[in-house]
């Protein structure tokens, strides 16, 4: 599996080396640059040329890092408990998987694009460093590790 650019995306040798190193090492690759320089298109072209699925997570100013992992809906669980719903017996019914969870859980290799990360809170990238480095995270509500 090697990326060398595509007919629609001309990349530099340095960029090809960086992309291929990330693929070989199975590590994240952070691409920085000015708007409109092709960062998003790079991820799409890598996934397309290598036949990999792409999982896109578009960041907004209000996005929190936790949302990429999962979200726990405690309010719905409380409401359902008051209504006597049996669904509350499985806390997993109230966990919504995020894009990072989907990428980690994927049976096939995939490209995870975390796009417009600069729009998020300044601590956003730091909040995901450990999870992306180890390629795993802990779900407190279910006491499980997602890899």
Where are the regions a protein language model picked out?
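Conserved AAA+/SF3 P-loop NTPase catalytic/coupling segment centered on the Walker-B
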Residues: 98-133
């Amino acid at each position: 599996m090697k990326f060398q650019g595509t007919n629609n995306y001309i990349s530099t040798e340095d960029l090809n080396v960086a992309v291929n190193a990330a693929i070989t090492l199975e590590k994240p690759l952070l691409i920085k640059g000015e708007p409109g320089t092709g960062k998003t298109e790079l991820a799409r072209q890598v996934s397309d040329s290598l036949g990999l699925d792409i999982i896109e997570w578009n960041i907004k100013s209000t996005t929190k890092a936790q949302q990429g992992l999962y979200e726990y809906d405690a309010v719905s669980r409380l409401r359902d408990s008051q209504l006597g719903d049996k669904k509350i017996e499985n806390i997993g019914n109230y966990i919504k998987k995020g894009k990072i969870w989907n990428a980690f859980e994927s049976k096939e290799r995939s490209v995870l694009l975390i796009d417009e990360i600069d729009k998020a809170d300044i601590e956003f990238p730091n909040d995901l460093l450990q999870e992306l480095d180890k390629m795993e995270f802990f779900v407190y509500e279910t006491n499980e590790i997602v890899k």
